[in-house]
Swiss-Prot record:
Pfam families: RecA, RecA_C. One of its GO terms (molecular function) is single-stranded DNA binding. This is Protein RecA. It comes from the Bacteria. InterPro entries: AAA+_ATPase (IPR003593), DNA_recomb/repair_RecA (IPR013765), DNA_recomb/repair_RecA_CS (IPR020584), P-loop_NTPase (IPR027417), RecA-like_C (IPR049261), RecA-like_N (IPR049428), RecA_ATP-bd (IPR020588), RecA_C_sf (IPR023400). Keywords: ATP-binding, Cytoplasm, DNA damage, DNA recombination, DNA repair, DNA-binding, Nucleotide-binding, SOS response.
Length: 355
């Protein structure tokens, strides 16, 4: 950059700082890069697939899927994990369907959980915004976007047409709260439902409610599906679940994770630790027997998982090794890609300059 441009830029930056305060504009290289803080989802496989060890703080996340696919269970699991680290959590229950007993079984400290059951969509989003601006809440769940009914629709008659009201409400609210969420370093999760588009001949007819604004403002979008049943004999005790990361602004998207949700217990975390431990060579498997560091921990996956439940220190040790191995490998791969892209850009710049 020539001297005239440098002086002009310095003058502009000085004027911006005087008018808007120090730090309104900054050079990226002047500040050390910091990793994005994350909150665990309660599923080890999903944390690893997300690339940063969980859902990013200071961002909006959307979780959507069919009925009974595990959306609320996954969000309650996020709350339970956040509370273990002393976080303050809130649940905006627009569906008026939160079961405190079930939440307690998943590990949620119900006594410390802030709960709101708003009457209208405007009230729900205003409460969410006020909680965010308090800078005192770490995780907010909104369940669900489909239940955020505009006041005009509630006060109107059955059968009245209210075209686009909910979409406009969501668009306005997200414009307002996105900046506050970043400043408060708060994770806001919107649960959403699926609807079918009529007359779609090609591509998926599925869409989510509430317009397109949430799709743009969300840093992470998770598509959760029930893929099968978990059985003990003839009794169904849980569901096989697959989560696909449809959008991810903090790591590569389109990864997926599979895990089991056990009814009344939540995500089968010890089962994931066994499976990932075997795949990473941390847990030895010989026939039906599982062993860790030469010591047998159980015959069959269920018994091995039961052993980890009875010995949480060993389970935590294996999980820590899995996280370090897979998350560091992912970070190293991303750094390598970034360095390669930078080198390619330098080569192109040199070629353009005639070197």
């Amino acid at each position: 950059m020539d001297d005239n441009k440098k002086r002009a830029l310095a003058a502009a930056l000085g004027q911006i700082e005087r008018q808007f305060g120090k730090g309104a504009v900054m050079r990226m290289g002047d500040h050390e890069r910091q990793g994005i803080p994350a909150i665990s989802t309660g599923s080890l496989g999903l944390d690893i697939a997300l690339g940063i060890g969980g859902l990013p703080k200071g961002r909006i996340v959307e979780i959507y899927g069919p009925e009974s696919s595990g959306k609320t269970t996954l969000t309650l699991s996020v709350i339970a994990e956040a509370q273990k680290n002393g976080a303050t959590c809130a649940f905006v229950d627009a569906e008026h369907a939160l079961d405190p007993e079930y939440a307690g079984k998943l590990g949620v400290n119900v006594d410390d959980l802030l709960v709101s059951q708003p009457d209208t969509g405007e009230q729900a989003l205003e409460i969410t915004d006020m909680l965010v601006r308090s800078n005192a809440v770490d995780v907010i769940i909104v369940d669900s976007v489909a239940a955020l009914v505009p006041k005009a629709e509630i006060e109107g008659e059955m059968g009245d047409m209210h075209v686009g009201l909910q979409a406009r409400l969501m668009s306005q609210a997200l414009r307002k709260i996105t900046g506050n969420i970043k400043n408060a370093n708060c994770l806001v999760i919107f649960i959403n439902q699926i609807r079918m588009k009529i007359g779609v001949m090609f591509g998926s007819p599925e869409t989510t409610t509430g317009g397109n604004a949430l799709k743009f403002y969300a840093s992470v979008r998770l598509d959760i599906r029930r893929t099968g049943a978990v059985k003990e004999g003839d009794e169904v005790v849980g569901s096989e679940t697959r989560v696909k990361i449809v959008k991810n602004k903090v790591s590569p998207p389109f990864r997926q994770a599979e895990f089991q949700i056990l009814y009344g217990k939540g995500i089968y975390r010890n089962g994931e630790i066994i499976d990932l431990g075997v795949s990473q060579g941390l847990v030895e498997k010989s026939g039906a027997w599982y062993a860790y560091q030469g010591n047998k921990i159980g015959q069959g996956k269920a018994n091995a998982a039961k052993y980890l439940a009875e010995n949480p220190a060993i389970g935590a040790e294996i999980e820590k090794q899995i996280r370090e191995k897979l998350l560091k490998a992912g970070a190293a791969a991303e750094a390598g890609k970034a360095a390669a892209a930078e080198a390619d850009a330098d080569d192109m710049a040199d070629a353009d300059a005639g070197y």
